[in-house]
Amino acid sequence: MKIMVINGPNLNLLGIREKEIYGAKDFNQVIDYIKEEGKELGLEINCFQSNIEGEIINFIHNAYFKKYDGIIINPGAYTHYSIAIYDALKGVEIPTVEVHLSNIHKREEFRHKSVTAPACIGQISGFGEYGYIMAMNALKKHIKSK
């Protein structure tokens, strides 16, 4: 089972940016953790990160053309306003889980709304990097049940 993990803007700054919110692990440590846990679950995990909306959309399109079974996406700030990412997710019809390291509902009001989540089968928020593992388990179960 192939899963694409897409991380959006500023996630490459993990371990540098607002450690009290996002944790002390750097981006590469989080990616290594995701890949290790994915392997234990029998998943093929490929991770991508971009600060550019169009590149994120290209990753989503590539997931379709390369026949990925699922997508895990942390759109970063694009969560709150990217209709283009929403449209890309809806367009490829690949089961997707949206993940956020912090609880977006406990933060600034402008972070409470996700325009991308309605294109997903679910959203996981507030569990740090473990949210990605929760998403892998949820996707695996969802895909197997089809």
Swiss-Prot record:
Coiled coil: none annotated. InterPro entries: DHquinase_II (IPR001874), DHquinase_II_CS (IPR018509), DHquinase_II_sf (IPR036441). Transmembrane segments: none annotated. One of its GO terms (molecular function) is 3-dehydroquinate dehydratase activity. It catalyses: 3-dehydroquinate = 3-dehydroshikimate + H2O. Keywords: Amino-acid biosynthesis, Aromatic amino acid biosynthesis, Lyase. Substrate binds at residues 74, 80, 87, 101-102, 111. Its EC number is 4.2.1.10. CDD domains: DHQase_II. The active site is at residues 22, 100. The keyword Transcription does not apply. Homododecamer. Belongs to the type-II 3-dehydroquinase family. Catalyzes a trans-dehydration via an enolate intermediate. HAMAP family: AroQ. This is 3-dehydroquinate dehydratase. It comes from Clostridium perfringens (strain SM101 / Type A). The lineage of its organism: Bacteria, Bacillati, Bacillota, Clostridia, Eubacteriales. The gene is aroQ.
